[in-house]
Design a protein with these regions (language model features):
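Paired small-residue
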Residues: 191-199
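Helix-loop-helix hairpin linking two adjacent transmembrane segments in secondary transporters
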Residues: 24, 28-75
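Helix-to-loop junctions at the C-terminal end of transmembrane segments
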Residues: 153-165
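Extracytoplasmic gate region of multi-pass secondary transporters
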Residues: 96-155
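A late C-terminal transmembrane helix in Major Facilitator Superfamily
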Residues: 23, 32, 218-243
């Protein structure tokens, strides 16, 4: 769903693409803020299997209705057809051309670093809790800081992308993530968990927006769907490899 949403937004918006993408990702980040605490509370009153059943039924019942009412009045058109002023003439790259471009390889490796490493951290968080002697709910509580940082960064990133372009922001994207890993290595206090996950949230906020806007800036939007499909597949592989 996130792939479809970000691709559609990248095609539809031009001059305000950064802000539009940051708004689109707001829902996911909000869920990341609310769901960990909600699930922990739910586990105290019911079995985890029942929780999955409730979530599945809720999605089946409400997602089609919500989707229908949100998009029924929207006429989606591509960047080439909408009324925004196009400031630059970008070559429309096909996916077969993109994979031969050295810039794609360099940028993709930069973007894949965080999902690769962070997924490993999230999957083995119980080991981190044990190794650090943190409380049982320390990381779950820290995920709220992660989500807040991610949401705030989304809107900052959207503004900065529209002002400075994605290419100029890419080099800064993983710096907070690097600092978070250093905190994880060298600090033992439970408080450090909040800084650790908060900084990951900052990088995540940048990555969510840059992961779509960068490709649109570099390669145009005519074939952005197939390009995003490739990068999303690489991201999924990197998360599996990270574990």
């Amino acid at each position: 769903m996130s792939h479809t949403a970000s691709t559609t937004i990248s095609r539809y918006f031009t001059n305000t693409r950064g802000k539009a993408l940051s708004t689109g990702w707001f829902g996911l980040s909000t869920a990341e803020f609310l769901m960990p605490v909600t699930i922990i509370y739910a586990l105290t009153i019911m079995d985890w299997r029942n929780i999955w059943i409730i979530i599945s039924v809720a999605i089946i019942l409400f997602l089609p209705l919500v989707s229908y009412f949100l998009v029924k009045e929207v006429k989606l058109s591509s960047r080439e057809d909408n009324n925004e002023v196009i400031k630059e003439n970008i070559k429309q790259w096909k996916r077969s051309e993109v994979i031969k471009d050295y810039r794609f390889i360099i940028i993709a490796l930069n973007m894949l670093a965080m999902p690769w490493i962070a997924t490993g951290i999230f999957v083995y968080q119980s080991f981190i809790l044990s190794a650090k002697n943190w409380g049982e709910y320390t990381i779950a509580q820290s995920f709220m800081v992660y989500s807040i940082a991610s949401v705030l960064t989304l809107f900052v990133a959207g503004y900065l992308i529209d002002k400075f372009t994605s290419r100029k922001l890419l080099i800064y994207m993983n710096i907070p993530f690097l600092i978070s890993l250093l905190i994880l290595i060298y600090f033992q206090s439970p408080v450090s968990s909040f800084f650790f996950l908060g900084l990951i949230g900052v990088s995540n906020g940048f990555a969510n927006v840059l992961g779509s806007s960068t490709w649109a800036e570099l390669y145009g939007v005519k074939f952005i769907g197939s390009i995003k499909a490739l990068t999303t597949a690489l991201m999924v592989f990197s998360t599996a490899f990270g574990t």
